[in-house]
Regions:
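Hydrophobic alpha-helical segments, chiefly the membrane-spanning helices
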Residues: 1-375
Length: 375
């Protein structure tokens, strides 16, 4: 790489310096910045600072993972992308679990929030803006059905079934039930990858569009002239501070919830928003560009990967920590999950979308947000 290309690369990756500087600041002064006795204004600034630093760094991680996916092909490309996003989410959930041992619902709340944000927020926005600009849009019905055929049983087995087991008290699973759930998640995701990248690759593309694995890049422009190994190094360079900062984010989330007397489920929403936003931006851009197939792949693909990979990983973390995790949803959350899954099956049952379908999903997302505070 020549000097000009190097300068362009440095300019395009300016946020890496911000991310590293933020990590050093919390490494050196983290205890003071996150102290429970700190002024409310200081705590608010720390919370916003960390949230924005993690969010933008995560967008950069996703961007470089997407470039690697394009260069390395499948299934390695898909695995890199999903593992990068899952690592960020797992670090965030683990941090909250460590600092809030009296909140055993954080994993459940985060998984549920991811489902609501993606299936209602991201899908609703993508369908609405896409149909508003292009009236009706098409996608491959078989691919959408395959996504949902895996998402629905994983969501039901992990978030509803624990309410009806009798081996342990409360909305929990026994050790062997948790192990089965983890193995089932990994097994179904492996089978899905085999279908997506091999035997039925065409189900995830629409005639006239490029291969359905593509993602709309987010987090800034691509590093100019960067090779695969440079994208790999930059991905690792961003991943180290973003995982560290995600671990530091546990205390500010806990402080914010206690200071505002907010519901504990809000912590899961914040973590889910960090994970879903980078790909959500790509999904909306794709819908606006009349590439709904790509948007569907981004939304449903990221949801499936999040559920299938985060649950087994967090089960292992909970065992290592000796922590109890509540999985079963209760009350209005239970109803919202069933309603969202049912509406999603109807939405992705025709191969074409319109404004009304997007509006319905967005209304469900607004209802979800309302019920967090008024449930």
């Amino acid at each position: 790489m020549d000097i000009v290309s190097t300068r362009r690369l440095v300019r395009s990756e300016w946020f890496l310096a911000v991310s590293i500087a933020t990590s050093l600041a919390f490494l050196l002064f983290g205890d003071a910045l996150k102290a429970d006795s700190a002024d409310a204004t200081v705590q608010a600034v720390v919370f916003i600072w960390l949230f924005l630093a993690i969010l933008w760094s995560a967008m950069c991680v996703v961007r470089h993972a997407e470039h690697l996916a394009e260069r390395l092909g499948e299934p390695l490309g898909t695995l890199i992308l999903t593992l990068a996003v899952t690592a960020i989410e797992a670090a965030s959930i683990s941090a909250v679990m460590v600092h809030s041992r009296d909140q055993p619902t954080v994993m459940r709340d985060t998984i549920f929030a991811v489902i609501m944000i993606i299936l209602n927020g991201m899908v609703g926005t993508s369908l609405l803006v896409g149909a508003w600009r292009h009236r009706e849009q098409s996608y491959n019905l078989q691919g959408a059905n395959i996504y949902l055929s895996v998402v629905v049983p994983l969501a039901v087995m992990s978030l509803i079934m624990p309410n009806y087991t009798h081996t342990t008290p409360g909305p929990t699973l026994s050790f062997y039930q948790q192990e089965f759930l983890g193995v089932m998640c990994i097994g179904l995701y492996a089978a899905f990858l085999a279908v997506q990248t091999g035997r039925h690759r065409g189900y995830f593309a629409l005639e006239g569009e490029e291969d359905g694995h593509g993602h709309e890049l987010s987090g800034g422009a691509a590093a100019p002239g960067a090779s695969a190994w440079q994208h790999a190094l930059l991905l690792l360079a961003y991943m180290i501070p973003v995982v560290y900062l995600a671990e530091q984010f546990g205390e500010p989330i806990d402080h914010m919830i206690r200071r505002l007397h907010a519901p504990a489920a809000l912590g899961g929403v914040i973590i889910a928003a960090l994970v879903a936003t980078p790909e959500g931006i790509g999904a909306v851009r794709s819908a606006l560009a009349n590439k709904l197939q790509r948007s569907v792949n981004i939304c449903l693909g990221s949801l499936l990967a999040t559920i299938a990979l985060t649950i087994p990983l967090m089960i292992v973390v909970a065992h290592l920590m000796g922590a109890t995790i509540f999985l079963g949803l209760e009350g209005t959350s239970y109803v919202m999950l069933l309603l969202t899954l049912a509406v999603s099956v109807l939405t992705f049952g025709s191969g074409r979308t319109n404004v009304l379908q997007g509006a319905v999903h967005l209304i469900l997302f607004i209802a979800y947000v309302l019920l967090i505070f008024q449930g």
